[in-house]
């Protein structure tokens, strides 16, 4: 009986010891995860670093050189709600995901489409916007063109921004056309205005804005967008705390109507156009 009591006592002590060790290990893991969380890092730093690339009307420079646009408003509001400053890190689109993964900034807020190929490299928040691919074309070179089939020919040249979803859309829907890639969309529009390409594939509503800006040279050949894609924040994998916060924040600003109001201002009106350079 005495041996049984001793044995049970030892087993109980061992169980308590193992339990304490497990709790300590769990605590260490939690502390490590918390310490590595982008949210915790941003709060300690006091600055949210946002990777982005300029394209109308998501992000662009006004007459004073300051960044304005839908994504600029979104990132600024996000930082304000976190109680920190925002720092924008302009980055070429083709290298923006590698820059995120190497810690150049904390999050990509730049109209990034949620694609399976991208999701293998980064995590995405829930969508906070939806967009689609459209085209703006040269009036003389693309005279009479009104369908994708008109542009899907070997003699047609299409321009798109390097590294963006327009490239994937052009390859999928216009496989027979010649595709020229550029670092940013301003270059694609300049090539179009110079008559060196038939059309530019880009996210709506940029093509419509360019056609309104240069009505003597450009037009929108398609009656509606030919793709639809969700837009989300991109962040590094494995950071559940940051992903949770971003998702809840998006839900909050959607519920209060702020996102809808900002979308209307930047995508449905031209009240901001006189701010541009």
Question: What positions do the PLM features span?
Answer:
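Periplasmic-binding protein-like
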Residues: 130-137, 204, 208-250, 268-277
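Beta->alpha turn/N-cap motifs
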Residues: 51-56, 89-94, 103, 107-115, ...
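Extracytoplasmic small-molecule ligand-binding "clamshell" domains
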Residues: 27-111, 120
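Extended ligand-binding regions for polar small-molecule ligands
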Residues: 25-36, 73-81, 139-142, 149, ...
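Bilobed "Venus flytrap"/periplasmic-binding protein-like clamshell domains
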Residues: 49-57, 67-80, 134-184, 199, ...
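Short helix-initiation/N-cap motifs at beta->coil->alpha
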Residues: 36, 72, 88-98, 143, ...
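A ligand-binding cleft/hinge motif common to bilobed small-molecule-binding domains
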Residues: 95-98, 111-120, 169-172, 193-227
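Acidic, polar ligand-binding/catalytic clefts
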Residues: 76, 80, 85-150, 218-219, ...
